[in-house]
Amino acid sequence: MTKLAITGATVYPISRPPMAGATLLVGDGKILAVGRVEIPSDAEVVDARGLHLLPGFVDPHTHVGLWGEGDGPPAYDGNEWTSPTTAQVRALDAINPFHVSFADARSAGVTTVQTLPGSGNPIGGEMVVIKTRGRTADEMVLRRPSGLKGALGENPKRLHGQNHKRMPATRMGVAAVIRQFLTRARAYDPEKGRDLGLELARKVLDREIPLRLHAHRADDILTAIRIAREFSIDLSIEHCTEGWMVVDALAEAGYPVTLGPMLGGRSKVETANLTFRNPGILEKAGVHVSLMTDHPFVPIAHHRIQGALAVREGMSEAGALRAMTLNPAEMLGVADRVGSLEPGKDADFVLWSDHPFRARARVLATYIEGQRVYEAKSLS
């Protein structure tokens, strides 16, 4: 077994407090030990004194590899807008593993992402959790399926009601489409004819995967909770821009939320109440919070900046780091593999020149499963 020892860094395991002057020992793509570690004589040693070592960031809501950037509408593979319910489509089938966004992710210290269909349809399709390196999309997969994407609010109203003059054209219609689809899934009998979309929906009803609902506005957030309770399903609330306005309801419901994108203007009516205070307010109320970029809508390279601004506006530093690592890993069902630096987990980690929330901090090296996949300068 080839071993690698990163020595002398300030290590942030996330699952426990930071450790100064610690060592991370890895071998065969896994973490072997963290802390005061006896270094094997045959290990390759990287002297990381003065550096900061963290788990790779986990971005739980992106369109990395799926959504064109700078190449126009023909490359927008995020929304299969031909029908309001498209649970049968799979994000995996549209991922371009050679897309520049994967290199951007690695250079920003993001080693795991969930990539997913867009929010044009009330029922959008199958989501997938992937690592940000690999020669094929299948090689990247960490969990599939990781959820069923759905959407409330303005996007499905506009795309279907306004643009195509069909249901849904109102918030009532959007919720009705979702309810009707889940009701059909309850009655699904594969012996009467196979339906890939209803098969996925049955996984939601059986609580094998969650329904992940796009909801910015407070009333849409409450509708998401209402639907999840009606069908006794697992839910994550995506965006949750006005979550701070219904924080008590979120805390009582107990569903995880994924906040963002926050680094940008209030470009749509649903983001009129966007604030960087949202993460801190929800954290203090005990809500399970993760942060997202929604790449490319906030470039994945700016993920750490959102965390820093959340801290400035009231979130704890430890909470913000957790919201970018272990919390999303837990919410995505992959915390046994990624999200913290613990023995037995994948050796996905990042060496930073400073704490990642400091303005001048930069990624010096990114490792995925013990292999260096990005390097800013020589460290050995």
Task: Show which residues each predicted segment covers.
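Metal-coordinating catalytic core of metallo-dependent amide/deamination hydrolases
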Residues: V128-R226, E230, P296
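Active-site core of metal-dependent hydrolases
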Residues: A91, E154, Y188-T275, S290, ...
